[in-house]
Amino acid sequence: GGARLSDGELANGHFYGATLLSNISADMLIYREETFGPVAAVVPFDDDDDVIAMANDTRYGLAAYVYTQNLARALRTFEQLQFGIIGINDINPTSAAAPFGGMKESGLGREGAREGIEEYLETKLGGISI
């Protein structure tokens, strides 16, 4: 269930309070879709391979976040995740100087940085013999 906020700052519906969801199953939309809002779904897992498989089990792949103190685990997880942006112990791994974009159905190409402008350029090759 849920309830409509009726008082306080959030009563007018312009904001959504941070929400943590548990008891999530793979058939729920929150498990499969990209939710743009302050919502986090908590899903238990057995090991790294299990959680990586669950994370990649989606048509989308904009951003993923990993929290660990183990550098080897962080690098291994980074390599296996199918997301365009991955924050390791970082909630904001992007910058204006970095290429921004997702994988799968989260978009093609990149915005920003050199990779972003290259899609708008025409390359020419010329050869001259005199």
Tell what function each PLM region has.
Residues 1-9:
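Short, solvent-exposed loop/turn elements at beta->coil junctions and helix N-caps
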Residues 12:
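Single, function-defining residue in the core of a domain
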